[in-house]
Amino acid sequence: MNQPELSYYGTGRRKSSVARVTLKHGNGQFKINNRVAKEYLKSDILIKDALQPLSITNTVSEFNIRVNAHGGGISGQAGAIRLGIARALLKVSADYRPGLKVAGMLTRDARAKERKKFGLRKARRARQFSKR
């Protein structure tokens, strides 16, 4: 009887973006929302950023990656994908943890847009003050 193919799941968040990442053993295909990653992210820098956990663990062409990303912008989604891939790799093998931890791949970037306060123009920008 055929065994179901093992898949490893990880969730990443960045700003208001959420990425649900699934890793399966394969040849290195990378799809985001059923589109090729190069077509979705467009920038090579963002693709390199998203795949950083795989390059740290030397597993770039060992896994097929499927991502469901929503919310925020492209840069935030790339950061969310990076965290999701790192978390999924931990489920593949705990041996990857030290390298990913040192590189800061397992830390959720908590920075987000600060809310606008009433009486101000933006979060901190006040109206120009005139003494006279």
UniProtKB/Swiss-Prot annotation:
PROSITE patterns: RIBOSOMAL_S9. One of its GO terms (molecular function) is structural constituent of ribosome. One of its GO terms (cellular component) is cytosolic small ribosomal subunit. Pfam families: Ribosomal_S9. InterPro entries: Ribosomal_Su5_D2-typ_SF (IPR020568), Ribosomal_uS9 (IPR000754), Ribosomal_uS9_bac/plastid (IPR023035), Ribosomal_uS9_CS (IPR020574), Ribsml_uS5_D2-typ_fold_subgr (IPR014721). GO terms for biological process: translation. Keywords: Ribonucleoprotein, Ribosomal protein. Belongs to the universal ribosomal protein uS9 family. This is Small ribosomal subunit protein uS9. It comes from Mesomycoplasma hyopneumoniae (strain 7448). The gene is rpsI.
